[in-house]
Amino acid sequence: YTSIKPLGDRVAEAEEKTAGGLLLTETTKEKPSIGTVIAVGPGSLDEEGKITP
């Protein structure tokens, strides 16, 4: 409804759609928690100055 205007603090969130018109659900908006490691460093130094992986 494009003719409806919110009053005061009664604001409705707009539906998020892709360019093709698909509605995005909350689960598709989450950032991925799985990735691929492509490089690693030598490690970090501990209090004694030794490198720990």
Swiss-Prot record:
Gene3D superfamilies: GroES chaperonin (2.30.33.40). Transmembrane segments: none annotated. CDD domains: cpn10 (cd00320). GO terms for cellular component: chloroplast; mitochondrion. Residues 1-10 are annotated as: Cpn-10 domain 1. PANTHER family: 10 KDA HEAT SHOCK PROTEIN (PTHR10772), 20 KDA CHAPERONIN, CHLOROPLASTIC (PTHR10772:SF63). Forms stable complexes with cpn60 in the presence of ATP. Homotetramer. This is 20 kDa chaperonin. It comes from Populus euphratica (Euphrates poplar).
